[in-house]
Amino acid sequence: MNTEESRQKIVNTAIEMFNARGCKGVTMDDIAQSLHMSKRTLYEIFENKEALLEACLQLVQAQLKATHYETAKRVEEPMLLALYITKSMALSNHRYNRLISETKRYYPEVHSRFFALHTEEVRRMLQRGIEYAREKGYLREGIDAAEAVEQLYDLLQSLRIKENDNCDTYATQVGEKAYTYFRGLMTVDSIRRYEAHEDEYKHLIEEITTKNR
């Protein structure tokens, strides 16, 4: 196994362990033992736990970003794409809730460095979709795309993930809130168009749900 393969195996194992037991509850020694690897080998690849956590967050974000861009190629209706991205974010946040929340609590610099960038990228993607929908005449007059995204994030902040939350229940709550919010931005004609496409792309929502459950 070469260094890159070893690195990937370490990251995948660490994500599972951090998410199951928490970042504070897992030591570098624990990870080395789980992989039947010497501590020296582990520290040659990752100098400390912070570096390993960064790699874990990078992988989680890269997977989510790849899903967003792949979906953007397949979904033509901009407001449906915005809903899909919002729901997939919720599912990913639920799946990796403990990893993300404990990184934020115990390693705030690591969390802010990576999640600030990721959040900004998602905001820009949502904003571009809303701007495109506005240009096409799908939205009511006077809708500001940047403000709409900010209000959406404020709305979703009210849905805090609890440790015993069911993934599907949480994602449904987020999806329903986002759905109601997006409908409020649209004209009557665009709502009809939105609903006509909803069933057409329903399998995409089911696909992301299955992948992130």
Where are these regions (language model features)?
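Helix-turn-helix
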Residues: 9, 13, 17-51, 55
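Short, charged helix-capping/linker segments at alpha-helix termini
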Residues: 24-25, 139-143
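Amphipathic, non-transmembrane alpha-helical scaffold segments
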Residues: 53, 57, 61, 104, ...
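Hydrophobic alpha-helical connector segments
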Residues: 55, 66-98, 149-152
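Secondary-structure edge/capping motif, primarily at the C-terminal ends of alpha-helices
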Residues: 71, 100-103, 159, 163
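Amphipathic alpha-helical segments used for helix-helix packing
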Residues: 87-113, 127-128, 194-198
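Amphipathic alpha-helical packing segments from all-alpha helical-bundle domains
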Residues: 110-138, 146-157, 161, 172
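C-terminal peripheral helix-coil segments that are non-catalytic and often amphipathic
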Residues: 131, 168-213
